[in-house]
Each structure stands twice: as C-alpha cells, then as structure tokens.
Curated annotation (Swiss-Prot):
Domain of life: Eukaryota
Basic and acidic residues: compositionally biased ranges: 624-635
Residues of the active site: 186
Family, as annotated: Belongs to the protein kinase superfamily. CAMK Ser/Thr protein kinase family. SNF1 subfamily.
Protein name: Hormonally up-regulated neu tumor-associated kinase
Keyword Oxidoreductase attributed: no
Reaction equation(s) it catalyzes: L-seryl-[protein] + ATP = O-phospho-L-seryl-[protein] + ADP + H(+); L-threonyl-[protein] + ATP = O-phospho-L-threonyl-[protein] + ADP + H(+)
Low complexity biased stretches: 1-16
CDD domains: STKc_HUNK (cd14070)
Species for this entry: Mus musculus (Mouse)
MF terms (GO), sorted A to Z: ATP binding; protein kinase activity; protein serine kinase activity; protein serine/threonine kinase activity
Gene: Hunk
Keywords: ATP-binding, Kinase, Nucleotide-binding, Serine/threonine-protein kinase, Transferase
Amino acid sequence: MPAAAGDGLLGEPAAPGGDGGAEDTTRPAAACEGSFLPAWVSGVSRERLRDFQHHKRVGNYLIGSRKLGEGSFAKVREGLHVLTGEKVAIKVIDKKRAKKDTYVTKNLRREGQIQQMIRHPNITQLLDILETENSYYLVMELCPGGNLMHKIYEKKRLDEAEARRYIRQLISAVEHLHRAGVVHRDLKIENLLLDEDNNIKLIDFGLSNCAGILGYSDPFSTQCGSPAYAAPELLARKKYGPKIDVWSIGVNMYAMLTGTLPFTVEPFSLRALYQKMVDKAMNPLPTQLSTGAVNFLRSLLEPDPVKRPNIQQALANRWLNENYTGKVPCNVTYPNRISLEDLSPSVVLHMTEKLGYKNSDVINTVLSNRACHILAIYFLLNKKLERYLSGKSDIQDSICYKTQLYQIEKCRATKEPYEASLDTWTRDFEFHAVQDKKPKEQEKRGDFLHRPFSKKLDKNLPSHKQPSPSLITQLQSTKALLKDRKASKSGFPDKDSFVCRNLFRKTSDSNCVASSSMEFIPVPPPRTPRIVKKLEPHQPGPGSASILPKEEPLLLDMVRSFESVDREDHIELLSPSHHYRILSSPVSLARRNSSERTLSQGLLSGSTSPLQTPLHSTLVSFAHEEKNSPPKEEGVCSPPPVPSNGLLQPLGSPNCVKSRGRFPMMGIGQMLRKRHQSLQPSSERSLDASMSPLQPTAPSSLSFDMADGVKGQC
C-alpha cells in the first residue's frame, strides 16, 4: 500500500527559508537509516504543513488561500503537496459553470491532452488531475517568479539583452509545439510566467479565451484581451496556420522592448485596428534599439502570412542567437518522453521501497508522462533533489545519490570502547618508545607523520609506571590485529599513512561516506532499474565448482513514446499552405507513424513487430453530475478575512486601474459572452463552414485519454 499522507514527517523544519528564501544546502542533512534520499528531500516538517495557510484539502494537496490568477470559469491558487512539502499551482474549475458551456469542457479536455503529450523546459508540466463533486483540479508546477507582465510594469521596459533571452525561450517552446502539430493561438504576456531560475514558462493550452477566433460573431467592443495579439488573418476570419503564433510573438517582443502594444486605435474599432495592421502603421520604437532587433521585429509583424517567417526561420535569426554561448536553439531537439536512462534511480527506489508503489507502475507512469499522483510525487521529489544538489559541484549527476550520502551517520559518535581503552593503555608506552628511538634533532623538524601526539600533549601527559614486557607484547599484537582487520574490511590504505589522510580529508570536505573511527564504509552498487538482455545459461566445466545461477533481470512493461522527429523531415508540414483545423485532438495523423517508437527493442527477441502496449488513460475521469442528485457539501473552512479597502490590489490584476490601459486582462471568450446575446451572427462565411464539423463530446463521460490524442489533426 502506498504511504499515507503525512508519512515521513520530520520533527524539525526541513530547511531554513523554505517559504521561498535562500535554502541552506551547504551542509547536507543526514539520511535516515535505510533511506534512499537525504532526510531534507524525503521528509516534510510538521511546521511547514501547519504554517501553510489553506482552506481545503483535496487528495494529497492543501488548497491555499493565496490566489495566483482568476478567469471566468477557473481560479488558480497556490497549493502544497503534503507528501513532499513542495508548492504547486492548482487550477480550480467550477463544475456547475463549466458543464453549462460545452466549449469549456471541450477545451478542458484539450488542455489535459496537450500537456500530457508535450514536454519542454519552457512549458509548464501538468502533474495531477483530480475531481470532486463540485470542482475539477488541475495540478501544475509552480512558477515562483510570477508573471512577466508584472516585471515589465516594474521596469517600464526590458533591455534588449533580457528581452532577447525571453524571446529565444518563447520561440523554442512554440517551435516545439508546432513540431507536434499544436498551435497555441493565445500567446500573450499574461500567459508567460517565470520560474525560480528566471526562465520563461508557457501556460494556458485549452482554457484560453479564443471563442471569437472561430468566427462565430463580431463581439469586440473594447480594446481588451486577445485582439491586440491576434494576427490580421485571424481578425479577417481567413484560413490561418501556425504563423499566427509568429505574429503573437512579435507583439510580445514589442511589449517587452517598449512596455506598450504595437497597434492601438482610439476610439477602438476592430476594423480600424485591422487596417492599421495591414498598413504597417506600428507605434514608434525606442531609438536605442539595435538595427538587428528592429528588423527582426518588423519581420515578425509582417501582415502577409506568406512573407512572414515560420517558426524555424525565426529561431535561426542572427539577432536572436547573437552573443549566445549555448548550443544553437534551432539545432536542439527536446524529446516529449523521458528515456529510461534519464530516470532518477534514487527517487524510484524511494517510491518503491518507502512509499510502497510498484516499480512497473512508477516507471510506466513517468515514461508515459501520464498526469496522476505517481507522476506528481516523482516530479516534485526529483525537483527537490536537484535543488538540494545544485550547490555541490563535487557530486556528479550520473552517480546514484545513495553511494554518496545515504550512509552518513546522524551524529558524531565517540570511538569504540575497546579501541579507546586500548589507546589509553598504550599511550605511555608509545611515547617512551618514540623518545628512545628518535634523536632530538628529528623532534625539532616536526615530523608529525611518525608521531601520534603533539608537543603540548606530550608535556601534559601524566607519569605512569613502565608496563611489563608481557603486557607490551600483548598490546602490540592486539594493535596490529585491529589494523589488519580494518584494512581488510575497507580495502583502503592504513589510516596513519599520508595517502589515507589526504583521501579522508577530501571525503570529509565533501561530506561523503566516512565514520568517526576513520573507517571507510564499503558502499554497494545501487540497484538501478535498467533494461538488460537475458544471459545464456552457463555450462560449468567438469572441474569447476558449481556456480549458482543469477536471477533473471526484471523486464519492465514499456509504453509507446512520442519522440520529436527530425526537423528536416517535417518542415513542410508547417508550410503556409497547410491550414490547421481546430479539433479536440491536437496530434496529426501524418506524424503518428514517424514519431512512435518503442523504448525497449531488445526485449522482443525473435519478434518482427514492435512492442505494442496501450497508453494508460488518466485515472480520474470527468463525469458530469446529474441534476437530480442533491449537492454534497465539501469540508471547507472559512478563509482568512480580506481587507475591505482596495489599496492592496496587485499590479496587473483586473481591478487595478493602471492595468487596464496597456496590458488588458480580458480575453475574447469573456467579451463573447457579454455581447453574444445582443449581436447577430456575421454575414461573412465563418471558419466552421470551411472546416469539418467538430465531434460533439458526450457530457456523461469526459476523460483524458492519450490514445485519443493521436487520432485527430490540428
């Protein structure tokens, strides 16, 4: 049985400054006996759980009182995972509101499919999905750096070098999406977050307010939300492709460099805004910008999609890669699945041995990137371990952590009683023997390698009687026996030698395996789960001794992997002539055969077909409650009181007056619902007329099945 919530709690705080401050990782915590992770990583302090302000608990998560964002149907709150003590972001979706709008339920399903299919360092990771009687919960990794829009508000504008770094990361993430056949369609400053390392994290893949993009009506009566970031062909209700994201990247780049939007009209009119985009009547740029930055920005904001560069061409731009020390981004490919060699053996062993999960369940869940509680525990523990090791340059990532810190004893113990008493008996004898053999000139040189005591200790030694010769012989033999036993056990040189002293000094400086009695503890090799081939049975010879047969290696049940394909093979799929259609499944059929592969081909000996194991669907399904069933109350405590005055509104919130002019917070879907009742459908041909009809989703059974993700075409 998996460990219950609250197991592994520590009596003391996990680390100072755990609420977001600088953590003290210079001195590693001692590992518990038989543990595969240090106590700071595997344990959670009770004070951290008690001090976290929350009003509800759902599963293994505490729903915090701090609100990170809010939309028309969802609220994003800060949460705490009780098994790891790590903070997460939880998107809470109201069931009663969502089930009234099929658009929301469809995009909710789409967001889960896309985020389980995509894996990129600049895209947020979906960890878990939960469902209660009244709400859906999407658990994602927390970005403590906040929103990029807040940073622009504080600095007024970003300098060119910082904006180039953010734009490079954004283009890399969008290029990865386009490679998988996904068009984001709602790239704006509000959807760009910053992690603890000041890197871009892209969010919002399904619940973005883009209903007006589909061409249902013309609801725009205010210059708010997505219209300011939409491409001209999108506003004109023409067929569009992945280049609409390139235009949105240009608008974001302009906002970073200037602090305003590139195209604005007063009073607002959608037709006037479109005409200004077509005429290239961009607002003036700062004079301190370089020529390369201006040329790249104008190329992104090209109104003609044929002349506008695609995402691969934008990623290879000279200005974007100027002064870039790393590998060229256009030559980097990120796999959508973790390989078996990249799994953290320490975390896997901890989850199987300490938390009680099956080894095959942990490996299959992580390799398939299926959002559930197992993936959340692995991701949070691995992230916590990486943060713990970040300040230690002498520890390599390829070495299992068990071989370095698992065997550290909790406290410094005294010497063994027998050895301590032996040193007391032989102290006077060794002192007199050394004084008789060595001349006084050698004592002045301070040859401490052959003298067990310092001068101060020699002067303060009490006088004892000379021991008998029989006792001296017995003590010498016993001392030699102890040294031989230690050397045979550890396999290291004598502790009194110079080599051993240097080796122990290096080991103790890095806080590696060492005991108080100067013995080096033998460390067995870690049990890393890996795929190996079956060994042929060994036939012993007639004269050789019988050898026990080795145990057969564990054959792990693998799942299919959607790896990124080569860039040259599929660039034509993203050509301007190819127009994407908005369907519930984001993966192209043309990419299916070229991107699927099995992880363990060596397991199928004699088989011509690859390993076919169906992908696991999400354990939690979205089933709508019946109208006749009475609602059940959730155990919700009253949240802490909120100040009545409006002086503490965060910058960039919908209620802040300063946030309404430059970076509006409303989306297209919100404005649609405000004016959808009064406006008539446009006479122009809608986008749906030129597309195949969307497949209706049955409201009674709505699940995140990754197998559906490869059937459709975006």
